[in-house]
Amino acid sequence: MTQKITVLYAVLLSMALWGCGGGGSSDSVSDKVWYVVGVSIPMSNTTPRSCKLDVDTFADTCADGEFLLDHTTPATFTLTRVDTNTDPGTLALENYTIQYVPMNPNSPVIPSLTVYHTQQLKEGDNTVTLEVMDVERKTTFAALFNSGQQSMTILPVGYTAAYTFNGHNSYGQSWTYHAQAPIFVGEYNECVPCN
């Protein structure tokens, strides 16, 4: 069975809704609310394990060898126009940072990752391939266990992948929003690679 977990619904503001100081809102471009943004990441609880958010950090010895690649997953960014009488333009996703927040404070620290990825987002559903963890972080994580600094008995280790997305809209204004998803990092001992 596959379930879709919505990790964020937020009103995306191009700039502050209210002016500083006295007075109310204005009708300038900088004060508009253009879209309501939803971000969803598909998750699966099927057997065998899901390749969506289970991150395999160990390259196993298989007939052909297990490939150790950057781990990615598809995400759907849904943009719903707030005012149907105006042209909201598009949003450009320019980069995002992932903070790996351990579910157990005694878990190994995984350094944050910044990904420079430019993609135009338009009204409706937009599929974006998100990095979950790159090979550098996978091999650093695995080295802690291979060297004996961490015990294999704690695997898999749960983290919250906290994403901060940054970009600009068609009017050149900056925007930022946040989403998060649980990931489980470990040794899955499978010879069918997940990328």
Region locations from a protein language model:
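Non-catalytic macromolecular-recognition regions in eukaryotic signaling proteins
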Residues: 21-195
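Bacterial N-terminal signal peptides that target proteins for export
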Residues: 1-8
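C-terminal motif of bacterial Sec signal peptides marking the signal peptidase cleavage site
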Residues: 16-19
